[in-house]
Regions:
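A short, glycine- and basic residue-enriched loop/turn
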Residues: 60-61, 127, 292
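Active-site pre-Tyr helix/loop in NAD(P)-dependent dehydrogenases
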Residues: 57, 149, 295
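Catalytic histidine-centered segment of alpha/beta-hydrolase-like enzymes
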Residues: 292-301, 305
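Flexible "cap/lid" subdomain of the alpha/beta-hydrolase fold that forms the substrate-access gate
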Residues: 2-29, 38-40, 79, 86-120, ...
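Conserved HGGG/HGGXW glycine-rich cap/lid loop of the alpha/beta-hydrolase fold
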Residues: 41-88
Length: 319
């Protein structure tokens, strides 16, 4: 798929850089919904049980373009949202801790008029999906996480595994004031393309697709808002609010869970993600995609979407 080529003479805005079409020309619906005191942009396709898709860093809803079509074709109401501070959603001055971001997600479920949803989260979106399943279990029908361990395993790996600490060096770099924001938008967001390319396996997204993410990062304030959650996640480790969050996440996930990971993921090591099932008291399936990196849903969208749809349709997913 090749993304629409933006006009470099036009400064990026949410309207021009985010409200895009889908690869096959399907009539995706863009709209805004209110939740948890903010406005969120969503892209929607299809009818049926709600599947809410949550992007990671450094992306926005468009990362799920292939899965929106696959899910809609399979009989689901597929909705990809932009997280707080990203894409077409509000850039608020605060509220980027994971507990509040999880309330954004469950609030969007309610604003869409649904009693619950299957949450599908990648990277940071996966971290928040784990969190939402613990905090608001009645609103989460099923849970799918890609490229992200359970928050408690993430914390443990970051503190005790030098290999994981080194793999996540970008997160440590985010702790500096001002500098990361400037780096992300320099040269029309060139670093965004470099990160996605470097974190992918042998089949990274096309350059035209990387240009879409670069342009979206250059929307004013997006770079700052994109890294604020990671600042909280690191700086709060020894603070009372972070310790309270970590204790809260000891409560088990009690919904069927599918955990997907790329064997070549250089950002989140397989050994850090594997074993997250210890926090799930429900059917849990671990699936490792050989030869894929940090973005399996983009690197091999057919394999990822097939695994996702088959599992969602399985009435009794295995442990």
């Amino acid at each position: 798929m090749t993304a629409p080529t933006p006009d470099p003479s036009i400064p990026p805005t949410a309207a021009t850089a985010v409200r895009l079409g889908l690869p096959g020309g399907e009539a995706v619906t863009h709209r805004d919904v209110a939740a948890n005191g903010a406005r969120f942009h969503v892209a929607e396709l299809g009818d049926g049980p709600l599947v809410l898709l949550l992007h990671g860093f450094p992306q926005f809803w468009w990362t799920w373009r292939h899965q929106l079509t696959a899910l809609a074709d399979a009989g689901y109401r597929a909705v990809a949202m932009d997280l707080r501070g990203v894409g077409g959603s509000d850039r608020t001055p605060r509220g980027y801790n994971p507990a509040n971001l999880a309330l954004d997600i469950t609030g969007v479920v309610r604003s869409l008029g649904e009693p619950d949803a299957a949450l599908v989260g990648h990277d940071l979106g996966g971290y928040l999906a784990w969190t939402a399943a613990v905090m608001r279990p009645k609103l989460v029908r099923r849970l799918v996480v890609s490229s992200m361990p359970h928050p408690r395993r993430w914390r443990s790996a970051m503190l005790s595994d030098f290999g994981q600490t080194r793999a996540s060096s970008h997160i440590w770099g985010f702790q500096r004031p001002f500098v990361p924001e400037r780096q992300l938008v320099a040269d029309d967001g060139a670093l965004v393309g470099d990160l996605i390319r470097d974190w992918s396996g042998p089949r990274p997204p096309e350059e035209e697709d990387l240009a879409v993410y670069r342009r979206a990062m250059c929307i004013p304030s997006t770079a700052h808002c994109s890294i604020e959650p990671y600042r909280w996640m690191m700086r709060s480790m020894a603070r009372p609010d972070g310790l309270q969050f970590n204790r809260r996440m000891k409560r088990p996930v009690r919904v069927p869970t599918l955990h997907l990971h790329g064997s070549l993921d250089p950002v989140m090591r397989t050994r850090s993600a594997a074993g997250s099932g210890e926090y799930v008291e429900a059917p849990y399936r671990w699936r490792l995609f050989d030869g894929l990196g940090h973005f399996p849903h983009e690197e091999d969208p057919v394999a990822f979407s097939t695994e996702l749809v088959n599992w969602l349709k399985d009435p009794e997913p295995d442990r």
